[in-house]
Swiss-Prot record:
Gene Ontology molecular function terms on file: citrate transmembrane transporter activity; pyruvate transmembrane transporter activity; succinate transmembrane transporter activity
Tissue: In adults, abundantly expressed in the fat body, basolateral region of midgut cells and oenocytes. Low level expression is seen in the halteres, procardia, restricted regions of the esophagus and hindgut, base of the legs and in a subset of cells in the third segment of the antennae.
UniProt family annotation: Belongs to the SLC13A/DASS transporter (TC 2.A.47) family. NADC subfamily.
Protein's membrane topology: Multi-pass membrane protein
Protein's recorded name: Protein I'm not dead yet
Main location: membrane
Source taxon at top rank: Eukaryota
InterPro entries: Na/sul_symport_CS, SLC13A/DASS
Function noted in UniProt: Cation-independent electroneutral transporter (not associated with membrane depolarization) of a variety of tricarboxylic and dicarboxylic acid-cycle intermediates. There is also small, but detectable, transport of monocarboxylics. Transport is through the epithelium of the gut and across the plasma membranes of organs involved in intermediary metabolism and storage. Affinity for substrates is citrate > succinate > pyruvate. Fumarate, a-ketoglutarate, and glutarate are also transported, but not lactate. Transport mechanism that is not coupled to Na(+), K(+), or Cl(-).
Transmembrane parts of this sequence: 43-63, 82-102, 115-135, 153-173, 224-244, 270-290, 329-349, 373-393, 457-477, 509-529, 540-560
Protein encoded by which gene: Indy
Naturally occurring in which organism (per UniProt): Drosophila melanogaster
Amino acid sequence: MATETTKMIYTPPPLDIKMEIEIGEQPQPPVKCSNFFANHWKGLVVFLVPLLCLPVMLLNEGAEFRCMYLLLVMAIFWVTEALPLYVTSMIPIVAFPIMGIMSSDQTCRLYFKDTLVMFMGGIMVALAVEYCNLHKRLALRVIQIVGCSPRRLHFGLIMVTMFLSMWISNAACTAMMCPIIQAVLEELQAQGVCKINHEPQYQIVGGNKKNNEDEPPYPTKITLCYYLGIAYASSLGGCGTIIGTATNLTFKGIYEARFKNSTEQMDFPTFMFYSVPSMLVYTLLTFVFLQWHFMGLWRPKSKEAQEVQRGREGADVAKKVIDQRYKDLGPMSIHEIQVMILFIFMVVMYFTRKPGIFLGWADLLNSKDIRNSMPTIFVVVMCFMLPANYAFLRYCTRRGGPVPTGPTPSLITWKFIQTKVPWGLVFLLGGGFALAEGSKQSGMAKLIGNALIGLKVLPNSVLLLVVILVAVFLTAFSSNVAIANIIIPVLAEMSLAIEIHPLYLILPAGLACSMAFHLPVSTPPNALVAGYANIRTKDMAIAGIGPTIITIITLFVFCQTWGLVVYPNLNSFPEWAQIYAAAALGNKTH
């Protein structure tokens, strides 16, 4: 029987069947093109985009077309992130010297300008605040003062987040606030006041309920209101100061590099005077929208409003949590006091450098041009020079407890800075500055200016609205800084071509690049809260409609009204801009 079985196994198949697979070889599943593209699309973009854009450079002679080719390639790489954003930003260091646009020395200098030093120094000072937990103390104290009912707590969290985000990075601010919200919500849920997440989803299988484990529980509307509130407040708060977000430094650097003789400079106090009022309006209206959408504001019979009404009973519970968190910080230390003094000193130095209404300290020192990078780095150096405590003084006295057994730490350590500073932003910002300067040196600026003269027939207000809409749309899908690097240089040349004040378009566009509310990938605060609270993309996309409409309308209105108070010449084409326009367009000034 065994012999017969063996024969049956090894009997060759009939002649009409084609054997393409050898005995013992396992058949492989068919390769799908969709799988190939899904896994290797980035490689295809990196390989094909430079080839497909080659006609721009090969069919047209001149440095301006070589620069345009590079701009197209980098723009696509930035938007698709086929290469890491920071790596794409390094391409001008390689390409500009080879293409004969700028020398290596000229290009590399643009990667460490005064604006960049100020930005990186500002991040380091903000990290000193984070290192000593001064930001937590401030946040918890303000929440204690505002109150802990659901609506008051939400308002307090949003306003604290907005204020802190003006000075420290949006991501760090959001990351700090998330655990505070989580602790409050968990305690409220334990007391039966509210729920953090919806009940698990069940499906009927064979007449029995089965838990759908593949779908984790998603947050309730009250939870969404708190988490999305701090994410949006972080993005909006960053619009308030020059150092609030990298996007602000991007358009400041590009504007000042392109228009060095401009009489309207982007200094610290003027920018705050321009942007803080609109920032407050954005934030307050966004708070009202989130309250209406998630907590039933002005809808007393809604389910959400009734849940908030029950939540008022938990105000004492929330207050206990906040009080305990504040108590855990202990009394304010000499470490925190010194950091707070240095931070206030830095801000005062920003405001008094060249205030305009009186001689600033930079005018009194000497005739050299002193920028805001100087006080920023001065404070950074002081953070390393000053001790975190003065226990070493016990060596000089017999009182005050035991003497320290080791060295006294400084206000911040380099190890903390090294791990926390987003060093890649140096290249991302520098790449934008290099592209802006390369477009001017190569003549691409002149080319774009000539091409955009036809837009002169449109009213300025229509152009402004279109620019804001385009910036808000693009920044929803890509890095804010990358989008600013792409559109700001184009707007600079367009403003010269159609003879309107460059700041009229550049400043609103730069602010609009920070207004990303729809997707987790839009901005780091969105990604942080989405991951922390398991927020579904569709919930964030729907919730982002309100803040998007609010910020677009508010920014447009403020630019047409308050903007003219801060910059009275925005409605005119100034003489210094006429000189740049003549140089860019190849015409005489008129």
